[in-house]
Amino acid sequence: VRPAGGHISSPFGFRINPFTHSYAFHAGTDLAANCNSPIFAAHGGTVLYAGPNGGYGNFVLIDNGNGMSTGYGHIVNGGVHVRVGQPVGPGQPIAAVGSTGHSTGCHLHYEVRQNGNAIDAVPFMRNNGIELAN
């Protein structure tokens, strides 16, 4: 399931960090969605974390099984709709888009990790029949 609406505003990989102005690795894919629009669990699993998380702002982390996890960052204050330990299904609303943490505007920072290592969400989702690219 596509985790949010909007176009890709910042892809996975190296980029100029808008806060430090240095070349740095961006471990997720940013979707420029409207403020307060819904964020959906892209895959089913169990919520591992739900709350503030530094530069990610308000953040939800879901264990999707088989070493895979998905992260959802910059959630609006008061917009986390799940709790740690809660099972979630694909497409379930879990949060609302915001601009908390190191963010320059409303968007979802969507991160996919395999065995703890960040992977590019665009080909991963495409292989699962979901298009993130514009």
Listing of model-derived features with the role each one plays in the protein:
Residues 2-134:
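Catalytic cores of peptidoglycan-degrading enzymes
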